[in-house]
Amino acid sequence: MQPNDITFFQRFQNDILAGRKTITIRDASESHFKAGDVLRVGRFEDDGYFCTIEVTGTSTVTLDTLNEKHAQQENMSLDELKRVIAEIYPNQTQFYVIDFKCLR
C-alpha cells in the first residue's frame, strides 16, 4: 500500500470531500509542500486513505493574522479556527497555509 503524504483529523474528511474545506494550516514540519504537488490524503486516526488533493498555493500566517477568509476556507468560524489551531499547535504562532483542491 502506498503511504499517505498528509493526514487530516477524521472530522474534516466530509468537508474536504465536499469542497467546503480548501486550506489547511500547518506548522513548520509541513512547510515543504508547494503549488502543483499532488498528495495522497489519509485520516490522522487510522492513516486510512480517503482522497487525493492538489496544492494550489502556499503562504504564511500568524495566529494574530488569521482572518474571516481563512475561517471560511476552513469551513468554521474565526473563533473556532483560532481555538482549533491553538489546541493542535500550543505555544506556536507562525503557521503555513496550504491551499488545495480535492481531486478525489
Curated annotation (Swiss-Prot):
Active site (UniProt): 21 (proton acceptor), 24 (nucleophile), 74 (proton donor)
Any one of the GO CC terms: cytosol
Any Pfam family hit: ASCH
Superkingdom of source: Bacteria
SUPFAM superfamilies the UniProt entry points to: PUA domain-like
EC numbers, comma separated: 3.5.1.135
Annotated catalysed reactions: N(4)-acetylcytidine + H2O = cytidine + acetate + H(+); N(4)-acetyl-2'-deoxycytidine + H2O = 2'-deoxycytidine + acetate + H(+); N(4)-acetylcytosine + H2O = cytosine + acetate + H(+)
Function text: Catalyzes the hydrolysis of N(4)-acetylcytidine (ac4C).
Similarity section: Belongs to the N(4)-acetylcytidine amidohydrolase family.
Name recorded for this polypeptide: N(4)-acetylcytidine amidohydrolase
Organism: Salmonella agona (strain SL483)
